[in-house]
């Protein structure tokens, strides 16, 4: 998975949507969910790498007992790490920002594709955290999910820029 910043901390691509933009602006959520719908394919197909496997081996040997990560992709758990603290959350679960209802991300993909078939056909370059590089689109027709319980805003359980831990 690509990262947002280079080794010197400089942005490598356009800055992602902030928590404040996501919460305040419907069009920001439309942009987010259209890009996330396209980029989700990359998240589902991502596999743990040698570094993930090495950390599992260190855990099995008792060298480490807990892993704290800023990664939001769940690859440490998929590799077999058992005691993982996802400091920045996970993108494979969602929460309603009004009532706290929890949702798995995978079924939402089907909903997004069913309600937005014109976006489902798009191809985009891989970007961090389930995002895709598909700028210069009109997102105004993108149907986005609301909480099935209260109608509130649904957001991935990951820290966005400007969000709090």
Language-model regions, residue ranges each:
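Conserved catalytic core of sirtuin-type NAD+-dependent deacylases
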Residues: 1-165
């Amino acid at each position: 998975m690509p990262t947002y910043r280079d080794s010197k901390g400089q942005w490598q691509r356009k800055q992602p949507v902030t928590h404040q933009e996501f919460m305040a602006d419907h069009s920001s959520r439309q942009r987010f969910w259209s890009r996330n719908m396209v980029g989700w394919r990359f998240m589902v197909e991502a596999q743990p790498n040698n570094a993930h496997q090495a950390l599992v081996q260190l855990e099995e040997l008792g060298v480490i007992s807990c892993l704290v990560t800023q990664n939001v992709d769940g690859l440490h758990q998929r590799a077999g790490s058992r005691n993982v603290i996802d400091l920045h959350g996970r993108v494979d679960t969602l929460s309603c920002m009004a009532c706290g209802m929890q949702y798995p991300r995978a079924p939402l993909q089907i909903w997004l594709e069913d309600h937005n078939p014109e976006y489902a056909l798009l191809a985009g370059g891989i970007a961090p955290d389930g995002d895709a590089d598909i700028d210069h689109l009109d997102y105004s027709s993108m149907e986005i999910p609301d909480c099935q319980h209260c109608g509130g805003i649904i957001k991935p359980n990951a820290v966005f820029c400007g969000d709090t831990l």
